[in-house]
Regions:
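A conserved glycine-rich beta-strand in the N-terminal activation segment of trypsin-fold
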Residues: 17-25
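Alpha-helical scaffold segments that flank or form the walls of functional sites
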Residues: 48-51, 57, 67-120, 143-158, ...
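Active-site gating loops and adjacent loop-to-helix segments of metal-dependent hydrolytic enzymes
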Residues: 60, 81-92, 132-160, 202-214, ...
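Divalent metal-dependent hydrolysis catalytic cores, especially in the metallo-beta-lactamase
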Residues: 60-64, 77-106, 119-132, 159-173, ...
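Conserved, mostly hydrophobic/aromatic
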Residues: 126, 181, 211, 309, ...
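Active-site core of metal-dependent hydrolases
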Residues: 157-276
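His/Asp/Glu-enriched, well-ordered alpha-helical/loop segment
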Residues: 231-240, 258-343
Length: 343
């Protein structure tokens, strides 16, 4: 049995902030948490802050490789390293609107990564192609379409156990299709949508629990047309991700959203990698990425996201940590195993 002890000046459990705590870890599992009896500042395994590992449910690649362009396990291994260095022990690798062949290749890549013993990857997030072309953002219109039930069945059967999240526009997909996806154990996230306030609210009331990158590629909040954003703000339970880099969303807008949504707002990096290959060439412009002249992804890590939330938005550290761990775990129904520290 491998046993070690960690002392924390501050322990963020996901629910509370505790001071001067001792954690006993046996075989990679926390077995004890108790107040420290000793002065811990000089202890070898003493840390200023101990918090739940972060979770990024929308990230496309790292180190000059996008999964959609290089759909192999060799692309996911360095992505795990990138996420880990930014504090995220787990992630959902993402592929944007593309061909069916690329989706299948990405499914195979995740499967192979698991077979090779790869860590951290929870599965695949398929963003599109069943989205609204008027809110396509950087997605390529040539692949965007309304799906048939047979197309959905074929993709989900091929990706069984691999596909964990699908972002779609609820006004583009029938309720039959949405319910079929959900019945397959896949999280449906609403995004790249031009739905009206009432259409979006109806979709949330009918069971869509999550939306993708607040403010980006969705009908905006206006005083006579509250749109998709207004529906998210007003709904009592729907959660939504946000990209806190100051480019995807102004920091003051994040502050407004946080006041409206509270624990329903969580962080994704939406991070991509620089590449000139494939239909989505990404070029680093300052500290963000553009594809074909359109904002297409961030250069964030989850750790830099926390720093932005605290320094730029004014969110307390304890709450910022929840937004990168506890809340995304809840959004993908993983709260029992991720997003908190407990015995």
């Amino acid at each position: 049995m491998h046993k070690k002890t960690i002392l924390a000046k501050q322990l963020f459990t996901g629910n509370n902030c505790l001071h001067n705590q001792t954690l006993v870890i046996e075989d990679n599992r926390i077995t004890e948490i108790f107040p420290s009896d000793e002065l811990i500042t000089n202890h070898t395994n003493c840390y200023d802050i101990v918090a739940p590992a972060f979770l990024d449910i929308q990230i496309y690649g790292a180190h000059d490789k996008l999964l959609a362009v290089y759909p192999t396990a060799d692309t996911i291994f360095p992505l795990y390293d990138y996420c880990s260095k930014g504090g995220a022990s787990h992630f959902v690798v993402t592929v944007a609107t593309n061909s069916n062949a690329v989706f299948r290749a990405c499914i195979d890549a995740v499967k192979d990564y698991w077979h090779q013993g790869g860590k951290g990857c929870l599965g695949l997030h398929v963003e599109g192609p069943w989205i609204n072309s008027s809110k396509k953002g950087a997605h390529l219109e040539q692949f965007i379409h309304e799906p048939s039930i047979n197309e959905v069945i074929d993709l989900l059967e091929y990706g069984k156990g691999i596909i964990k999240i699908i972002t779609l526009a609820p006004e583009v997909c029938s309720q039959e299709i949405i319910q079929y996806i959900q019945s397959s154990g896949i999280i449906v996230s609403a995004g790249h949508s031009n739905a009206t306030y009432h259409e979006a609210t109806e979709a949330f009331d009918n069971g869509i629990e999550t939306a993708t990158h607040l403010f980006n590629a969705m009908s905006p909040l206006q005083h006579r047309a509250p749109g998709f954003v207004g529906a998210i703000f007003n709904h009592p339970t729907v959660m939504c991700s946000i990209v806190p880099d100051g480019y995807h969303v102004d920091f003051e807008a994040i502050k407004i959203a946080k006041k409206q949504m509270g624990d329903r707002l969580f962080v994704i990096t939406d991070a991509v990698a620089e590449t000139t290959v494939g239909p989505y060439p990404h070029h680093l412009v300052g500290d963000r990425y553009e594809s074909n002249g359109i904002l297409s992804g961030s250069a964030l890590t989850m750790l830099s996201s926390v720093k932005n939330l605290v320094d730029k938005v004014g969110i307390p550290l304890e709450e910022a940590l929840r937004m990168v761990s506890t809340y995304p775990a809840k959004a993908i129904h993983r709260s029992k195993s991720l997003g908190s520290i407990a015995i």
